[in-house]
Design a protein with these regions (language model features):
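Metallocarboxypeptidase
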Residues: 1-145
Length: 145
């Protein structure tokens, strides 16, 4: 974790505190999971940027789903997946104030699990690329650069 903190700190310094998005890529579930991951009992308030994460999440998942028809969902981890503690997205949001902080869970929804067949790799990349383009468009439209 220390190396990750050092890297994000260095990147934050280079960007002069203007990071807009943080993404931790994982498989599998086809979800964009935003902060917070911790349970409502432990952390009852909402993230400062929850409205922006939800708005961007819809734009991004719509773009990803449109590529090949594989449905992507978005929402807070504690609502659409399960509560968890110590996630990098929560740390990026709270410590570095990066407003759009997610875990992107890529293909699939369980049939293949973590062993995605080779024929799904390029289509999955195409979905991620569409999502990244949608994210950049959202940032350009909604944030000062």
């Amino acid at each position: 974790m220390q190396h990750w903190k050092d890297f994000v700190s260095w990147a934050d310094h280079l960007s002069q505190g203007k990071h807009r998005a943080y993404i931790s890529m994982h498989s599998f579930s086809q979800m964009l999971i935003s902060s917070y991951a911790v349970s409502y009992n432990e952390f009852p308030h909402e993230p400062f940027s929850i409205d922006q994460m939800n708005e961007a999440g819809k734009v991004i998942t719509d773009a990803m789903t449109a590529v090949h028809g594989f449905k992507y969902e978005y929402g807070q981890s504690r609502e659409i997946l399960y509560p968890s503690a110590g996630t990098s997205k929560d740390y990026a949001l709270e410590v570095f104030r990066i407003p759009l902080s997610w875990t992107w869970e890529l293909r699939d929804t369980g049939k293949y699990g973590f062993i995605l067949p080779p024929q799904h790799i390029v289509p999955n990349f195409e979905e991620v690329l569409a999502g990244m383009k949608a994210l950049v468009g959202f940032i350009n439209e909604n944030y000062e650069t």
